Structures are given as C-alpha cells and as structure tokens.
Amino acid sequence: MQKVTIQEAEHLLQEIISEEDDRFQILIKDERKGVQKLISKWYKQKELAQKEKEKFLEMSKYENALREKGLTYIAGIDEVGRGPLAGPVVTAAVILPEDFYIPGLNDSKKLSEAKRERFYGEIKAKAIAIGVGIVSPQVIDEINIYQATKQAMLDAIANLSCTPEYLLIDAMKLPAPIPQTSIIKGDAKSISISAASIIAKVTRDRMMKELGEKYPAYGFEQHMGYGTKQHLEAIEAHGVLEEHRKSFAPIKDMIKK
C-alpha cells in the first residue's frame, strides 16, 4: 500500500474493523503524528463499542432468561410524566425481537434529545409491537397520578398488536392476568423497558411541544410541564390552563387564592 494522506488514512480506519487487517498493520507503523492520532481515536472507539456491547448484554439478561424458558412476546413497560404540573402521563409497552441490537441504548433520561429521536426511529422500525397509553390531566386529577399511571400502562398493553406472554415493568405491579416482574430502575437494567422509556419520552415531548405552540407564553416546549421557575411565573402571569393538573401543588393552592 502506498503512503496515504491523513484524510485517506481516516477513511481507511472507518472501514477497518480488526487489528489483523493488513492495512492497519501498515498504518500503525506510520510515524506521522496525524496518523498516530487517528490510530489512538480508532482504539478509543473500539473500546467504547465493546463497553456498549457489554452493557447491552447485561441489559438483555431478563429477556434472555425468559427466552430460555420458551417465551417470545416479552413486553417492557415504562412511563414518563408522573411529576410534571401539566400535560398527560404517557406510557409505552414494547416487544423486541431476539436479534434486536442498538448500541448505547439506555434510560431515556440519560440520553440527549438527538439520540432519543434516533433510537425512537430505530425502535419503531425494529420492534415486534409497540403500544402507547396516554392519560389526561383531568383523569389524573380524578383518580390520582399513581392510579393514572397504572391505567396508562394497562392501556399501552391493550394497544399492542399481539398479546404479551410476560411483562417487565419499571417499578410497578399491574392488575393484569399476565406474569410480570417489577424492576426498580428497570429503564437502566432491561433493554425492553429502556426501549419503552424512549418511546414514551419522545411521544410525550412531542405532545408538550405542540402545547408550546398552542400556548407560547408558557414555554411548554422547554420545561415539558415540569414546575420550573419559568413555568410557575407563567402560571402566575397568565393563569391555570385545562392542561394543568389541578390536584398538584402548587397549582391547587393557586386555584384557592
């Protein structure tokens, strides 16, 4: 192989997947600083990819154990929006295929918006089934947020295109005739729950951005309904909306004034 430019070396390293590659053996002997920097970057990316693979395998242990028992339709379930002062609580139930793999999958709260959007598209394309449950602020006020979250999860299961054989749920037990395991911080321990958290989060965020367009003075597209200083000041200035949860403090105290 003739001596390549730094740019050519960069393109080659994007193609090379093993140190055994003859081209890599030539590049590693190239003493130019630019090439050595690229080699160092290649090793770091390789190390990161390995860590992501190990993390993914660790997060697949619940699903793999159930598949060993002959189960196929394993639904991960998670919610987003229990804490905000406005907007619905949104849940998702996701059934993934056995060969599903997205490196870097994690709890939706730990991912950037750009990554969540990308993963959302991949999950939608690859999942066996996805169900979403949405419960309004009015119902939350009527039955309380805990019961509303349960209801949204049951709705998400009902909206799946196939019946799950087992449920993996993030920190919740459901009154459903389906075997289930409740996992504390499940969105960081199970790929199915993690996928559900991403579907629920992106779905709810999109709804809150639409509310932001409808009520520009409230900034819903920025705080997603949570009780930030900006949000509380907007309520003081412009009043309580039908999208606000009247049973949540400080909204209920503002109504009493």
Swiss-Prot record:
PROSITE patterns: RNASE_H_2 (PS51975). A divalent metal cation binds at D78, E79, D170. Manganese or magnesium. Binds 1 divalent metal ion per monomer in the absence of substrate. May bind a second metal ion after substrate binding. InterPro entries: RNase_HII, RNase_HII/HIII, RNase_HII/HIII_dom, RNaseH-like_sf, RNaseH_sf. Gene3D superfamilies: Ribonuclease H-like superfamily/Ribonuclease H. One of its GO terms (molecular function) is manganese ion binding. Keywords: Cytoplasm, Endonuclease, Hydrolase, Manganese, Metal-binding, Nuclease. GO terms for biological process: DNA replication, removal of RNA primer; mismatch repair. It is found in: Cytoplasm. SUPFAM superfamilies: Ribonuclease H-like (SSF53098). Residues 72-257 form the RNase H type-2 domain. Its EC number is 3.1.26.4. Its main location: cytoplasm. GO terms for cellular component: cytoplasm; ribonuclease H2 complex. It catalyses: Endonucleolytic cleavage to 5'-phosphomonoester. It is an enzyme of class 3 (hydrolase). Its cofactor is Mn(2+); Mg(2+). Endonuclease that specifically degrades the RNA of RNA-DNA hybrids. Belongs to the RNase HII family. This is Ribonuclease HII. It comes from Bacillus anthracis.
